């Protein structure tokens, strides 16, 4: 496992994938697509409106977490099955991947069969007092927008 400082976040692709520029040391850097290890988030590119809404919320949550970081870094594993680097994002000692799970924006995932229960994520968010997630999901299902 290697650890790199992240010089720049180029793009947050979705709730579990980011494009970053990592600092290799000696004035060298490299752009990498990192698949967040150990988690899976709802898809933001799907025809299922409920999953899409929750996927976009996961992406927004990750965006806000990363923006609030003081010193973002990644601990990498091997490359994943689609050629992306697998990694754990950290801000100090805080493991952002696991925070996504405990706050209800991702499921734990070990690379096997995906157990996707949108209800389970919704229950975690509701227990933490995040009622906005349910409202946007309802709005997506009824094709209305909230103000």
Where in the sequence are the language-model features?
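Small beta-barrel nucleic-acid-binding modules, primarily SNase/OB-fold domains
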Residues: 1-147
């Amino acid at each position: 496992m290697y650890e790199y400082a992240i010089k720049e976040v180029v793009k947050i692709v979705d709730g579990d994938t980011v494009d970053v520029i990592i600092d290799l040391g000696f004035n060298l850097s490299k752009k990498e697509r990192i698949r967040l290890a150990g988690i899976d988030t709802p898809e933001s590119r799907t025809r299922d409106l409920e999953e899409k809404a929750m996927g976009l919320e996961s992406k927004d949550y990750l965006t806000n977490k990363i923006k609030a970081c003081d010193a973002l870094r990644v601990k990498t594993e091997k490359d994943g099955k689609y050629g992306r680097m697998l990694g754990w994002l950290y801000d100090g000692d805080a493991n952002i991947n696991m925070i996504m799970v405990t706050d209800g924006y991702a499921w734990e995932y070990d690379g096997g069969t995906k157990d996707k229960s949108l209800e389970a994520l919704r229950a975690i968010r509701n227990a933490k007092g995040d009622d906005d997630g349910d409202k946007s999901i309802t709005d997506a299902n009824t094709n209305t927008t909230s103000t």
